């Protein structure tokens, strides 16, 4: 049975946090053992433009716009959101009501939500992290994390020194390096732990 991930790209997203979802699920589909393949489709989604410009200027053409799929969200099993840079206008879209409503829709149905780095702040803005464990970007060169404090201000219980935090259906992480591991965790949830371990080994992790 095919599973589907809606991979939301907000303006100013980080490429390093986007590509692991595509690669990990692609490797899962291409397993040499036909009986062991995980049929997980990744559908890239933009808010308002089919061509989304990332942090540092890489442009990605998405499969769909949110307005085109908003009435068919029941087809999707998970939502994934990479983070991005404030000075590349990431929060303009990530904090929009359209994104907040999308996040609330997935959470209300108990569907998996995977965020990388500061994308957790979009989850916080939506209200779904109040009273829940989560994390977000932590600058190891500074004593205090501005982003983690912002997440606290949204009502989250921030686990400051844990790279990936899972609370029920929600996965959050604290820097770009965690992106592949968030993708592996999502694969484990959409298929099984053994499949995720196998793909991780095949990819050299």
UniProtKB/Swiss-Prot annotation:
A GO CC term?
A: cytoplasm
Cytoplasm in keyword set: no
Q: Which InterPro entries match?
A: Class_I_gatase-like, DJ-1/PfpI, Prot/Nucl_acid_deglycase
GO terms, biological process? positive regulation of phagocytosis; sorocarp morphogenesis
Q: Which UniProt keywords apply?
A: Chaperone
Protein family (similarity comment): Belongs to the peptidase C56 family.
Entry function: Protects cells against oxidative stress and cell death.
Name this polypeptide is given? Protein DJ-1 homolog
Question: Which organism was this protein described from?
Answer: Dictyostelium discoideum (Social amoeba)
